[in-house]
Amino acid sequence: MNMAQHRYTLLTASLLCALPALAQQSPYYLGASLGVTHVSNIYRSTPGQPSNSDNVTTATLLAGLDQRIGRQRLFGDASIRANHYENNRNLRNNGYALNAGVDWQTIERLSGQLSVNSNRSLAQFNPGNGAPEITKKNIEQTDQARASVRYGLVSLLSLEGSLTHRRRDYSASEYNQYDYSQNTVSLGLTWRPSGALSLGVAGRYSDGKYPRFRPVANGFEADDYTRKDIDLTGTWVASGASTLSGRLSFGKRDASQASSRDFSGGTGSISWKWQPTAKLLINSNLMRDSGDETSFLAIGSIGGISSDYSRITTSASVNASYELTGKIVLDAGLNYSDRDLTDRFGINTVKSGDKTTTLSLGGRWAVNRSTTLGCQLNRDKRTGLSTLSTPYSANSYGCYAQLMVR
């Protein structure tokens, strides 16, 4: 998690809290937020380096809708933000996040979704896996477009397919080799024996490219790769308070240049949403996948994304919210990731790894139906010492005020 995400986590938590109440009254909302955060280690430097702490002020405008029109549903959330660094003025930047689409269905058996996601933000510093440790402004632009279709074969069985396009670009020339694009197609069957259980199997094929992987005399040499997976998926609503969902995949990745990042084996994820009491909500997640996939998990969200250049990342997270009173909510989160790193240029067989732990604590106060105040504290620490990853630790704390109208 980078320092930008520390800041935006404050806003994300409050927005997720405010939207359900607004949706009950109106399909539209407008909002604004102002937050100030102190970050102890902006550049994620290793211990012993000069201090690079800063105070960051973030102003955000928000808008969204969730509107049904007959059988169709339009949805969208958008934010525009301005980030003002007090000391590191060269890092001042503007960004945005977008998540929009339409759920559609016909009178007969056809239904599906069209969606677009986009995010523009300051890229994380010192991401590891041999990435350059720069201290200048580096803007990361990520985009995703997805179309899915479902056709009901019989009452319990449906045929489902999807097509997804992704791309990522950086403004800093030092990160040319990390620009990439990927197209993915998936086709499979889903069985729903009851409203509480669904099971699926699908084939998934991805074709991607790092177009500026390595500079050569007449330009750049590209690294093309393919990935083939068989996905087993399932969702079980155990009760009104507990929902489990998971994916188990068996696949293989092959690259034309960076063969050190090739892998063959199992990936997947499992998540558990549990509400043991009316006041407590716990979300847990366990995941193992390639950096190409984990980088896009949060695209379009207010909090931005966290790019991952690893061969394989295994992570576990637990996030909890407790309603202390009708107006006050306490939040806590713990995330742990273990990355398998390799020399992405494939020049040699250098292999390494690192481990990152992130802890967050916060609170929110709903002053009234439209105003929220909140504060949050974060601790971020990475261990691992090699040519591919260096250790660091960083703390951040801040508060915000948010106004939402409908």
Where are the model-predicted features located?
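Gram-negative and organellar
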Residues: 23-406
